[in-house]
C-alpha cells in the first residue's frame, strides 16, 4: 500500500497523460466552440454532463445546504459518517447506465473543482463498468498497488485539465507571477505548485531539484526566476518550430540535406534522373522519389 497526493512519476507516464488530456481538451473545444486556452473547469464539467449520464451528490457529516449549487446540474446532498468524510474527497461508482459521483463539499472550492475533474477522469478513461471498480479519492490515505496507477493518472490528468499546457505556457511567457497564475487559473497554491513542478521536470527536462528550486523562487515572487522560466519556455517552443534537417541518401552513396539534393538533381540529365528514380524505388526512399519526380516534370516543361 502506498500513500498518494503529489508523487513523482515516470516521464513516460506523464507524457501519456498529456496526450490523453490534450485529446479530451480538443474534443471539449470542438464541441463547445471554446479555444483550449479559455477552457475552465466549469466548461469541462458541462461537457461531461452533456455527454454522460451523471448524478452528482455533495456530502458532509451533518445536514447542510448545498454550498456550490451552480457548479454542477441538479446535485443531491447526502450525509455520510464522520470517518468517511474526514478521509474522502470524492467517490465515483457505476450504477447501470449512470455514473454516481460523490464530492466532499467541506473542502475549499479549488479542491472541490480538482476533485470533480479527478472523478471525471476516472469516468472517461478508466472504463468503470468494464473494470467493475469504485474509485475513492482520499486526502492522504493509502492505495493498493492495483489502484495506485489509476489514481496517479487521474491526479495528473485533472491537473492538466484544470490548467492546460497551452494556458500555462501563455501565462509564463507573459511574466505572470505565481499568485497571478493562481488567481487566473483558479488553482490552489498546492495544485499550482505541483503543476509547475511537473511541467518544469517532464516538459522542460529540468531535474527535480532544479524544478523545485525555480518553483519555490517563483512562489517568493523572484522576478529573475519569472524571466528565467519565460526563456526556458520560449526556447522549448522555438526548437519545436525550427524545421528539422532532412537527410537524403542518393545513388552515389552520399547522404546530403534536402536543399543540396534538389541542387544535385537539377544538374542531372533526363536519363540520369530516371536512374535516380529507379534507385529511389528500389531503396523505398520516398522523399528522394518525390524530389526526382518534381525535377523530372520541371525539365519537361
Which residues are covered by each model-predicted region?
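Active-site hotspot residues in diverse enzymes, especially metal/ion-binding acidic/histidine motifs
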Residues: 1-301
